[in-house]
Each structure stands twice: as C-alpha cells, then as structure tokens.
Amino acid sequence: MNLVYIITIIAFFSIGFELVFLHVPSVASVYQLCIKRASISTYLSKPLEKGILQHTINWPFGKKLLFIIIPTGISIITGLFPLICSISVLFYNRYYFEPLPVFNAIGCILIILGRTFTIFATLDIRKKNNQEGDSFMLKQQGFFKISRNPLLLGMYVMYTGMALLFFNYAFYIGLIIYFSNMHYRLLVEEDFLQQLFGEAYKQYKASTNRYL
C-alpha cells in the first residue's frame, strides 16, 4: 500500500523538477495571457489574426480572473490533494482514506506512464530545439508524431491514475476544472501555432491527433 504513496510523491517531485529545470514556453500560460500579453504578437511576423488567441488576449481582466486565473488556482490547490495525503500517510501515519484496492495497480501504472511520457517528451523537444527563453519550433517527430500535445497528454494520464487511487469529491471537481481549463488553453496555443507555422501546422494537424 505504501508503494502508492511513494509513487505519488515521486510523481509530484518530478513535476516540480520539470517546472524549474525543464521549462517549455507556452503562449497559453497564465503569465502570457494575463500579464505579458502584449509580447505574444512579437513572435509572429504579422499582426494577430482573429481567432481564439486574439479573443482571449482581449478579454477584460475580470473575465481572465474568472476563467483563467481562478480555475488555474483551484486546479493547483485541489491537484495537490494526492501529495498532501501521501505525505500525511507516510510521515505522520494519518489515514484520511483508503485507495480503492481494485484500482491500485492500474492507478500506479497510469501515474508512471503519464510522468514518463511527459518527461521524455519534454527532454525530446528541448534536446532538438535547445530552448532558451520563449522560443518555438514545430516538432513533428518522436512523441510528437503520436500526439500533438504529448506533455499535456502525459499529465492527463497521470491525474487519471491518481483519480483511481485518491477518492475525494473536491479532487474530482478540481480535475474537471483542470481538464477543461487546459483544453481551452490548448486551443489558444493551437491557434497561435497555426498563425506561426501556417500550412506546415495545418498539415501536421491533419496527420496527428490532438491527444491520441
């Protein structure tokens, strides 16, 4: 049983390491959409076209607060539930729940697969592009031949595994908000990539699915 909590803690530790040391730029981040929004057009050689990206950038701050900042905050807070519970069980012997036994193996496998997929896809894109700062490239090989968004797909798989192991209504509501929020921001990112890479990205979309 302790293996469930150990795997969960390692998964969150790897997320922290990834965020600090393996930064991958995104125009759909909270920082870019809500704070540094004026710089997004500088990545393009032409003015922003009408679409979900321009529409979202032009939202008033109140709407961004309601539909971007607050959902992101809720996702982060509720998303930490498995980590907090795992630490409490392993280090303080406090049992708030018991993972569903029938889902233990499946949940652990999904967590490991999800993190592995995200980490190796991140290393792949950074190795090919040697990304520093906010640079962008159209990656179509390796993990990106399987999915247009392998980093996010890996996070979805990981959290699905945790949902099988950690029963909590607030956590589940947070996951729904997280999936919805990230999917919308993914549409924003795709609009940007379509404008940045043009026909090349259109062909990539035709040959590779958004997730799987």
Predicted regions and their residues:
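Membrane-anchoring alpha-helices and their flanking helix-loop junctions
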Residues: 1-137, 158-192, 196-212
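Active-site-proximal inter-transmembrane loops
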Residues: 132-155
